[in-house]
């Protein structure tokens, strides 16, 4: 099955880096003012969605879903639901973090919504990759200078971190007390993270540009 790439309207400065994540057979959904990134990203839309309150409705033969301005879901959340309805199981989210904090938080929690539906999702912005970690082991290569684990769903237990500057064995992180910030992969190693109970947001920072 093809992967779905959802492109929002938040700022993107590192277009070259973002393009490196694209695959030839990706299905691209542009959300409203995410269309401003189309030329720089060099990816034609397979689907356009939005209420077009922040971008002019395009004159195009590409499939377009016009949404009402008054609605419960943001354009990005609608795009994710529509992609799931069409059978997509893997997602890449770009242009969805930064700028307005409310939209950024909603889009980070979109990772939770997708995971609850059994989908894989990765969020990429100018500074980092973000994904959720649960019982599966996730590897963090040395090319990421820092990484952080943030609890966004309550309490995470049985947290294990190896191959890093600050290892952890059977730890807990609560929403009210976050201590998993700015860990480092040891030179020549790959860090490995897993969680027995709950979910953690894994943020892998890119080297400074």
Which residues does each PLM region occupy?
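Short glycine-rich or small-residue beta-strand-to-loop segments that form or flank ligand, phosphate
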Residues: 65, 91-96
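N-terminal beta-strand-loop-alpha-helix module at the start
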Residues: 1-58
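Long, charged alpha-helical interface segments
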Residues: 128, 133-209
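Short phosphate-binding loop-to-helix
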Residues: 64-86
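Short Gly/Thr/Asp-enriched flexible loops that form oxyanion-binding sites at enzyme active sites
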Residues: 101-112
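Short, acidic/small-residue loops that bind anionic groups at enzyme active sites
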Residues: 113-130
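A glycine-rich helix N-cap at a beta->alpha junction
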Residues: 63-69, 119-122, 147-148
């Amino acid at each position: 099955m093809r992967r779905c790439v959802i492109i929002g309207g938040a700022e993107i400065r590192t277009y070259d880096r973002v393009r490196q994540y694209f695959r030839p057979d990706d299905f691209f959904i542009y959300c409203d003012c995410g269309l401003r990134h189309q030329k720089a990203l060099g990816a034609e839309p397979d689907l356009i969605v939005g209420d077009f309150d922040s971008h002019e409705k395009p004159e195009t033969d590409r499939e377009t879903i016009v949404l009402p301005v008054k609605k419960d879901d943001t354009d990005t959340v609608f795009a994710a639901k529509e992609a799931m309805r069409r059978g997509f199981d893997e997602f890449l989210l770009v242009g969805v973090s930064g700028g307005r904090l409310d939209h950024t938080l909603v889009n980070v929690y979109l990772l939770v919504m997708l995971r609850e539906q059994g989908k894989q999702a990765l969020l990429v912005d100018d500074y980092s990759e973000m994904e959720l970690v649960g019982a599966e082991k996730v590897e963090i290569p040395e090319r990421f200078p820092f990484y952080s684990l943030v609890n966004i769903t309550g309490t995470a237990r049985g947290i294990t971190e190896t191959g890093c500057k600050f290892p952890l064995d059977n730890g807990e992180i609560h929403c009210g007390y976050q201590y998993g910030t700015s860990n480092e992969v040891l030179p020549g190693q790959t860090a490995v993270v897993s969680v027995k109970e709950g979910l953690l947001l894994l943020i892998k920072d890119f080297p400074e540009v």
